[in-house]
Structure formats: C-alpha cells, structure tokens
C-alpha cells in the first residue's frame, strides 16, 4: 500500500427518509479523519445542500420508494422502474468502479435491505473479485432490521453474508441492542460481525443555546404530522413548561403553517434544530419518533443530562423498525414507548409523566461508532495487505 491512503468505495442510497444519508455522511467524515480516502457511489435522490468528505462522488440514476410501505420502487422522477433503467444503473456503477482502486467496498444496509439493487451489487462484486488484489467486502448495517420479511429473505441475507462478505459492521452497542433481536439467523454469521458502537454526531459546543423544557422532533418530518398535531394540543395546555416543536423540512407547508397559527406563546415551532442532541441535553423531556439517528440523540442526552425520552415510533405503514427499537429502549429503561398507531393527547400526557419518573441508567453506552468503524476498516485493510505481502 506504500504511502498511499487506504481507499474505500462506499455505496449507499436512501429510498424515502433521509436518515441513511446523514448517518453515511458521519461515517465518511470519520473515515476521512482516520486517513482513509473515500469514493462515494450514491444511488438515491441527491439531497440539496448535502456534501461529503469524499475524494469523489458518483451519482447513479436514482431509485426511490413510492411510499412508506416500500412495496413499490420508482425512478427519481417517480416513474415506473424498467429493466433498461436498472441496467443503466448497473453500467454506471461498473463504469465508476473501473476508474477506482478501492481496498474495501462498503455497502450500506445491503444485503439486510435494499434488495432492489441486488443485481448491480452482484455485478460489482463479480468485477471486484476479478482484480489481482480484490478489495475487502464489508456491510454497514444499523441496529434494527425491518420485520415482516417474505419467506426465504432472511436465508437470502445470510447466504450473501456467508458467501460474499468479509465483514459486517453493526452500528450498535450490543449491551443495548444486538442484531440478533431482529435477525434470528445471526448465529450463522456471528464470526463476521463487529459491533462498532452507535453512530452519533460529534458533540457541539453549544454554550449559548435557546433552552426549552420539552423538545418534540420527528426526523425529516415526512411521517411526523400526526405527532406534531397531537404534541401541540398537549403543549398548548401545558402552561408550566416551554415547548419547542421541530417539524423537520419534509413536513408539508400547510401542516407547518397550521402548527404556527395555533401555537400558544410558550410554544416555539421551528423547521430544524441544529445539534438536536445538544438541545435535548438542555431539556427535561424529549418526545420523538424512534428512527436510528433521533433515538441515538435521545440516548446521548439521557447519558449526559437529566433529559428523559418519550418515543412515538412510526408504525402505521407496516414498518416495524422504529417500533422494535422503541420497545427495546423502553425495556432497557431509556424511555417510554407510545406507538403512533395508539397516540392520543392523553396517552402522550401520561407518557410524559411516566418519563419524568425514569431513573438515570448508569450503564455507559458506546457512542463512538463512526470513529470505531474507521479504525476497524483501517485494521482490516492493513491486515489484508500484510497477508497478501506474506503470500507473495
């Protein structure tokens, strides 16, 4: 490898929500800080204003989910996916790979998700295997997998890992959530798993910060309208505390306008809170959905402050990921779970009261997932290089 930086090809896409993009960006920043050169292959719809600490970014013809059921996939222009369109994606991916010399290929979520791109990933791996110094193949996966899989899908995932991957980075602390909670075949791939810790944004210096007693957030806001409306009803009646509702940029303009028009004077409505975890640390209660990124912010706030969490997992479109995560976090004592399908003002009021009584959990949580991932990758690449040198 000489004096050249180890090089990574990081393949990812988001199909609907934006959480995957921001987690990928945090990982890429950590890889760059570790001295790894990163080439990004971006397979989803590009997000305005989002950049990466990468040497290059290669955009494929985008794929997106039609809705939150993820049962139908569309092009970036909301058109039906065709065989020709997917073939063009594959050609674009292989063309990008032809100009790169990665020491490792990382696929975010795949093969535990993103099945729609399995053919192009298969082609990429076959092309990589033909190279004299074939790159390591690494999967990057979050803590919880989506349930309700069709028969045979888990076995398919397992076989991909056993046959095609060298390592799986699980971005979780196994003392809090382990992959086996949602992947029953985990024992078949145990030797390839490495738990990195949770991936969270770096702590920000927020010495001057507008403080609120209760913060309500819903990630990007695409599925947060109901939570925001019910939270506002509770907030308006709670005159003893200041509230802040962070709607997310994807809540409809009409819904956001209605919230602002009906908010009492002690309730602040914003589109986005920069450094959400830091804001939570100055609050007494966090009410949020339970996507990966937001739940990690809530855990970090629990560890560093007196903030307590109410999780309102999105569960109304057949998705199980948030509900399972929220249930596990409630079981561990990190919050109170009220599924969105059961949400009422009274249920939310009771959950806030229950959350206030939660004791602080003394267990230290590993939040160094990004830096640890970078360190593991460097070690694996260097070990592969030493092994190759020995053989030659």
Show where each model-derived region lies.
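Nucleotide-activated donor-dependent transferases that construct or modify glycoconjugates
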Residues: 3-17, 107-109
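Conserved nucleotide-sugar phosphate-binding/catalytic loop shared by glycosyltransferases and other
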Residues: 4-11, 30-84
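A short, glycine/small-residue-rich beta-strand->loop->alpha-helix junction that serves as a flexible
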Residues: 12-25, 224-225
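Donor-nucleotide binding loops and adjacent catalytic segments primarily
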Residues: 28, 198-285, 323, 341-342, ...
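Conserved nucleotide-sugar donor-binding subdomain of glycosyltransferases
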Residues: 75-118
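A nucleotide-sugar donor-handling region in carbohydrate enzymes
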Residues: 140-225, 246-253
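A donor-sugar binding/catalytic signature common to diverse glycosyltransferases
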Residues: 275-324
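C-terminal amphipathic helix plus adjacent low-complexity
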Residues: 350-392
């Amino acid at each position: 490898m000489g004096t050249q930086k180890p090089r990574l090809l990081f393949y990812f896409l988001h199909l609907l929500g934006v959480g995957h993009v921001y987690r990928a960006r945090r990982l890429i920043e950590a890889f760059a800080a570790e001295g790894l050169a990163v080439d990004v292959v971006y397979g989803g719809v590009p997000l305005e204003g989002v950049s990466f600490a990468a040497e290059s970014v290669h955009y494929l013809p985008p794929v997106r989910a039609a809705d939150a059921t993820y049962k139908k996939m569309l092009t970036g222009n909301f058109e039906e996916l065709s065989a020709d369109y997917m073939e063009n994606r594959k050609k674009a991916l292989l063309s990008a790979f032809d100009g790169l010399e990665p020491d490792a290929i990382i696929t975010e979520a795949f093969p535990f998700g993103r099945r729609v791109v399995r053919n192009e990933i298969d082609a990429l791996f076959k092309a990589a295997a033909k190279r004299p110094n074939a790159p390591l193949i690494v999967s990057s996966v979050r803590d919880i997998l989506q349930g309700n899989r069709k028969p045979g899908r888990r076995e398919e995932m397992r076989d991909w890992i056993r046959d095609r991957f060298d390592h799986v980075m699980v971005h979780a602390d196994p003392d809090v959530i382990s992959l086996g909670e949602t992947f029953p075949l985990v024992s078949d791939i145990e030797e390839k798993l490495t738990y990195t810790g949770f991936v969270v944004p770096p702590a920000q210096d927020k010495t001057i910060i507008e403080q609120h007693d209760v913060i309500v957030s819903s990630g990007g806001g695409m599925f947060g309208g109901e939570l925001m409306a019910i939270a506002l009803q509770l907030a308006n009646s709670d005159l003893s505390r200041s509230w802040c509702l962070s709607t997310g940029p994807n809540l409809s303009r009409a819904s956001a306008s209605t919230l602002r028009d009906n908010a009492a004077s002690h309730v602040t409505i914003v589109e986005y809170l920069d450094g959400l975890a830091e804001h939570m640390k100055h609050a007494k209660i966090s009410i949020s959905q339970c996507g990966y990124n937001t739940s990690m912010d809530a855990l970090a706030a629990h560890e560093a402050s007196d903030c307590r969490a109410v999780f309102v997992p999105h569960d109304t479109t057949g998705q199980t990921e948030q509900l399972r995560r929220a249930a596990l976090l409630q079981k561990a004592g990190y919050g109170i779970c009220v599924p969105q399908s059961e949400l009422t003002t009274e249920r939310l009021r009771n959950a806030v009261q229950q959350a206030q009584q939660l004791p602080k959990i003394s267990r230290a949580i590993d939040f160094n997932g990004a830096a640890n991932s970078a360190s593991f990758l460097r070690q694996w690449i260097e070990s592969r290089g030493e092994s190759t040198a020995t053989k030659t």
